[in-house]
Amino acid sequence: MDLFMRFFTLGSITAQPVKIDNASPASTVHATATIPLQASLPFGWLVIGVAFLAVFQSATKIIALNKRWQLALYKGFQFICNLLLLFVTIYSHLLLVAAGMEAQFLYLYALIYFLQCINACRIIMRCWLCWKCKSKNPLLYDANYFVCWHTHNYDYCIPYNSVTDTIVVTEGDGISTPKLKEDYQIGGYSEDRHSGVKDYVVVHGYFTEVYYQLESTQITTDTGIENATFFIFNKLVKDPPNVQIHTIDGSSGVANPAMDPIYDEPTTTTSVPL
């Protein structure tokens, strides 16, 4: 117990000899004991500090975070708050164990530990999703699904809300305001353009992997909308190894999803026939 107390305590722990007063050989029922434990850090101030951190953490959710460094800073702060909460939980639990008052709070601590385990499992699952998507975006965004495709230059991973039958990827040419940069946009999320699209994209979730095939490309002459190109993907019902693709010259064939993209830099003259 002393080892754990010294490990999980800020400051120092003073272990004092047990002192029992008012005890007599005839009557030991009314004896009073002194807890042989004294922490140099005021526990109340630690709890108040973590409470303020939790309030500040909740307040930051109302602030618009658009840039990646802002999202990374917020997620890092959130992770530190969770670690502090776990520290306070273990610290207070060990103090109650040393005081012999653990039984009254056992169910409360069991609930807290259960919630902490869920949070830890969620972090592990997000890391696994990062590995599947080959990107750090699952750690930055809270979306449950991500639209991914991979080229020679870049691994794209854009947050997505749910599994749908159709996905529309909007390519901005960097001319329209207020966005003066080339990017790909899906449902309010965007990622800078580093290379072109592929003939298929994959929606990754915790236990989901759905393939979508490129069906058509709509340019300004098709839609009347300037400075944007739309790539329309439809959900595949076939097995992933047998993806039917449409090449630029109109021929069709069977390709493996691991193949290189047919084109890497779509232009305003690029059109994929249905």
Curated annotation (Swiss-Prot):
Phenotype for residue 171 to A: In strain: Isolate GD01
Topology of this chain in the membrane: Multi-pass membrane protein
Glycan attachment residues as annotated in the record: 27-28, 32, 34
Effect upon mutating residue 29 to A: In strain: Isolate Shanghai QXC1
UniProt cross-references to InterPro entries, sorted A to Z: a/bCoV_VIROPORIN_3A-like_CD, a/bCoV_VIROPORIN_3A-like_TM, Protein_3a_bCoV
Outcome reported for the amino acid change (mutating residue 117 to A): No effect on polymerization
All residue ranges annotated as the CoV 3a-like viroporin TM domain in the record: 33-141
Post-translational modification: Exists in both O-glycosylated and non-glycosylated forms. The glycosylated form is associated with the virion.
Residues the UniProt record annotates as site (Involved in polymerization): 133
Effect of residue 129 to F: In strain: Isolate TWK
TM spans (from-to): 35-55, 79-99, 105-125
Record topology, Cytoplasmic segments: 56-78, 126-274
Transmembrane keyword on record: yes
CoV 3a-like viroporin CD domain boundaries: 145-237
Single GO BP term: inorganic cation transmembrane transport
Extracellular side stretches: 1-34, 100-104
Cited PROSITE patterns: COV_VIROPORIN_3A_CD, COV_VIROPORIN_3A_TM
Keywords from the named record: Apoptosis, Glycoprotein, Host cell membrane, Host cytoplasm, Host Golgi apparatus, Host membrane, Host-virus interaction, Inhibition of host innate immune response by virus, Inhibition of host interferon receptors by virus, Inhibition of host interferon signaling pathway by virus, Interferon antiviral system evasion, Ion channel, Ion transport, Membrane, Secreted, Transmembrane, Transmembrane helix, Transport, Viral immunoevasion, Viral ion channel, Virion
Subunit structure: Homotetramer composed of two homodimers linked non covalently. Interacts with M, S and E proteins. Also interacts with the accessory protein 7a.
Role: Forms homotetrameric potassium sensitive ion channels (viroporin) and may modulate virus release. Up-regulates expression of fibrinogen subunits FGA, FGB and FGG in host lung epithelial cells. Induces apoptosis in cell culture. Down-regulates the type 1 interferon receptor by inducing serine phosphorylation within the IFN alpha-receptor subunit 1 (IFNAR1) degradation motif and increasing IFNAR1 ubiquitination.
Domain notes: The second or the third transmembrane region are responsible for Golgi localization.
Protein name: ORF3a protein
